[in-house]
Regions:
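Conserved phosphate/anionic-ligand binding catalytic regions in large, soluble enzymes, centered on
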Residues: 69-75
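Low-complexity, highly charged intrinsically disordered N-terminal segments
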Residues: 1-48
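Domain-scale recognition of functional cores that engage charged ligands
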Residues: 40-64, 75-258
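A broad "ordered helical/assembly scaffold" signature
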Residues: 16-18, 70, 80, 141
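Low-complexity, intrinsically disordered regions enriched in charged/polar residues
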Residues: 5-11, 66, 177-181
């Protein structure tokens, strides 16, 4: 990892998670009888009815947008970033996730008169293709805030042997980006937080690049500012199709969200 430019923090993170997996530490398990469902979550409509709409743009002006874009679209037949997958046709043009994301940002900037910087958290597998899209878009411009940060990379591990896998014909396949939890150390080490604070931004709206519904919202920005909370998450009801991914529960002992 050090030969690939990874920091001490990245190496320590990987070592810790590897040891947890190898040792099957009990502390890494969440027992069903120790948690309870999350209830009484206010709806977006409820939030909309309670905010001061005159102040909402002020909160939105202090908000930046970060898209998690480190994963490949291999399950969809792509060997590039998932955000490059065409998802709709508009005026005889195929629109990709990334095109719609850029459109959402440009629309918010124009309609509300805010800067709304966009940063992609790319991986070593997605950076080149997605940055080419941003840099060749004649309408998208941004200064002072980086358009991308690069998350860490770590060796792929064989579930059977616990050892790094080997692909002599294509060594790049021996490496992968970590999961979304890598976000926190990446934004810390990249200097993104310092850059945002220097430009007066206080809030960071984060969502996956393939989640077009989770777009920046002045309503949520104002609600977040009103609560004074350090962290807020927007959730949706799970359906039978939502088999992948986790869900939010509350720790019975502490009330902490997990």
């Amino acid at each position: 990892m050090r030969k690939h430019g990874m920091t001490d923090m990245a190496i320590a993170q990987f070592r810790r998670l590897y040891e947890v997996w190898r040792n099957e530490e009990a502390s890494s398990w969440i027992r069903e009888d120790e948690v309870e469902p999350l209830v009484s979550v206010p709806s977006f409509h409820d939030v909309y009815e309670t905010i001061n709409h005159d102040k909402a743009v002020d909160a939105f002006a202090k908000t930046a947008f970060l898209k998690l874009n480190g994963g490949l679209g291999t399950s969809m037949g792509l060997d590039c970033a998932k955000s490059l997958l065409p998802v709709r046709r508009h005026k005889a043009r195929q629109m990709r996730f990334i095109d719609i994301i850029i459109g959402q940002v440009l629309t918010a900037r124009t309609r509300l008169g805010v800067d709304l910087p966009l940063t992609l958290m790319n991986s070593f597998r997605t950076s080149k293709d997605t940055m080419k899209v941003l840099q060749t878009n004649k309408k998208f411009h941004q200064e002072d805030i980086p358009m991308e940060i690069i998350q860490h990379q770590e060796p792929k591990i064989s579930a059977e042997t616990g050892m790094p896998v080997s692909f002599p014909a294509n060594p790049e396949l021996e490496w992968c980006p970590p999961g979304h939890g890598d976000l926190f150390s990446t934004i810390w080490e990249s200097g993104l937080l310092d850059a945002l604070e220097a430009q007066g931004f206080k809030y960071l709206f984060i969502s996956n690049s393939d989640n077009l519904g989770a777009r920046p919202s002045r309503t949520l920005a104002q609600h977040f500012e009103n609560t004074g909370a350090p962290f807020m998450i927007e959730v949706a009801k799970r359906t039978p199709a939502d088999r992948k991914g986790g869900h939010i529960v509350r720790d019975k002992a502490t009330g902490r969200l997990m």
